[in-house]
Amino acid sequence: MEGFDTMALPYLASPLSLGNMQGTDYLNALQGMDLPDQRSNFDSETFVSGDDLTFAHLSPQTLKRFSSGYEDSFPEMVTSFDPPPPAEPPADSSIDHNNKLLSFSMPVYPWTLLDYSFRRASISISAQLHGMFFLAESPWTTSPTENAPPQQGAELTCYRRNLFQITGSVTLPRALRYIITDTGDRIPIVAHELTVSATESVEGNSVKIISVPWKTPAANDAGKDTGNSSNTAAKVEKEPPAIPLDMLTGQDLDADYATFPIAWKRLQFRVATANNGRRKELQQHFVVRLRVVATLSTGMKTPICEVHSGPVIVRGRSPRNFQSRKDLPLSGSAAASRKNAQAAAASNNLTRTSPSLTDKAKTVVKSSSPETSSNGVPQQSPPNWALATNSTLPPPTTTTLPHSSVYSQSSPEFSRPVEAHRRTTSAIAAPINLSLLDDDSLNLSNGDSRPHTSFSNDLASKSLSVDSGRPVKMRKVSHSMPQAQSRSTSATFLNTANFQQMLPVPFTSESADVLYEYFPLGLEDWQGPVDAVYRPHVVHHTNMPQMKYITARGQSKRYFAAEDVF
């Protein structure tokens, strides 16, 4: 290794002079290359660099479009391809998880199934739970989130009293004929049926599922049965019946397969699961199982296909015992639908307004009833029933008062002035006789009868009559229809008005209609003639005597007086 220079690079060109080399004509025979102008840092005479090498320049051919059958107006433009559509965002994972929680598993075959040609056959079962199911937070797991699967943070839960149903379909091959036992024997199949049952997860024991009837048997129907055995049988809880799978009655027109619908409604767990949230290792779950049971030629029944639901926790107590838990309703279950319905009902109740009493007070109802006016002498009444003002009534200008229909405004919406000097007329509210017989109006044996008067806004437009009666009845004033009695009525009216001016004024800023409002009666064609008893905030119906109604038929009557309202 003596004389070896470690800095020399033998794999490169030799650093010897070109003059000492023999046969260098091969360098001139090579064609030059059109390379970028990059000069070497080394001496060209001592090193063989790329500058001394030339190569032929090859120009690439331009791409040309194939000629089409028509003249292209834009030959330079190349049609651009449409980009692939963007991938759609995945749907909400909770919906998929909810469907998986409420649906059943893949079919499991305990036996090998064969058709008439001794080929293997299979059965398809597609079913789903429906009802008040929700995801309940477990005390030993984390709370459910949107990204985490519900199985990690919550479990499918329902209450025992809530009803549920199972819907779906089952498809069987029409050529299904044999089952193969463990010993290799072929046993023919005679019939098929679909059953529903449930088991618990701790020991695998069966759990009873009952079918709740639409209507409980009436007591009288149960009494018709003879014997205690019949009454006891009516109270026995019934299990959901099996669905027969008859190949001849299949709804599908397919020649190879028969499809049968599944519909079990109003199902209920008979008992609840134990240890709801107390100890994880002892938490009990219920599993709903659907089985296709085959009846063999030997008379034995055996399941040939089975699917099962997810584990379900059944609560037996009231929801208030689980208020500390977080419940997440499933979007595909009835729990979410009821929750949305309750929220909508609550919003409607906030915006809904009930009809006010003022609308009823403004309604005018006309009816015909006998008139009970009489020319009784008014007597003095206690000051507690009287209302008067500081002004006096002007004398009447005419003795003939034309009849008019003017009603008083008994409504809380009417605004009344507080000052007493703004009132120009007076009104009085006193108890009067409400008897429907004329004999009661002339009965003055009690000695403490009350006067009954009423005023109007326009004295020239009203005809009033005064009645007297027992003190236990309230005021009722009727308008007389004939104008012949207007003179006597006006005289009684003026005498009563002058007497009222001497009475004390217990309420100066209120009138009688504030304390006693009239609510008109709703009359129907089928109702008999009735009379209204004028009481505070209520109107009572009183049947009229037949003789009174016959004598006064055709006359009109008012149930309230047109009082002065300002």
UniProtKB/Swiss-Prot annotation:
Q: Does the keyword Transcription apply?
A: yes
GO MF, any single term = DNA-binding transcription factor activity
Q: Which UniProt keywords apply?
A: Cytoplasm, DNA-binding, Nucleus, Transcription, Transcription regulation
**Could you tell me where this protein is found in the cell?**
Nucleus; Cytoplasm
Composition bias (Low complexity) maps to 333-349
Please give the coiled-coil regions recorded for this protein: none
InterPro entries in the cross-refs: Fungal_trans_regulator, NDT80_DNA-bd_dom, NDT80_DNA-bd_dom_sf, p53-like_TF_DNA-bd_sf
**What residue ranges does this record give for the DNA-binding region?**
79-326
Under SUPFAM superfamilies, the record lists: p53-like transcription factors
Q: Which residues lie within the region annotated Disordered?
A: 314-422, 448-470
Q: What is one Pfam family matched by this protein? A: NDT80_PhoG
Q: Where is the composition biased (Polar residues)?
A: 365-391, 403-413, 452-466
Judging by the UniProt lineage, the source's domain of life is Eukaryota
**This protein's GO CC annotations:** cytoplasm; nuclear chromosome
A single GO BP term for this record reads:
meiotic cell cycle
Role of this protein: Transcription factor that acts as a positive regulator of nonrepressible acid phosphatase activity. Is a major regulator of responses to nitrogen and carbon starvation and is essential for the expression of genes involved in vegetative incompatibility (like pin-c, het-6, and tol). Vegetative incompatibility is a non-self-recognition system ubiquitous in filamentous fungi which results in programmed cell death.
This one is known as Protein pacG
Per the UniProt entry, what species is this protein from, by scientific name?
Emericella nidulans (strain FGSC A4 / ATCC 38163 / CBS 112.46 / NRRL 194 / M139) (Aspergillus nidulans)
The lineage, from the top, is: Eukaryota, Fungi, Dikarya, Ascomycota, Pezizomycotina
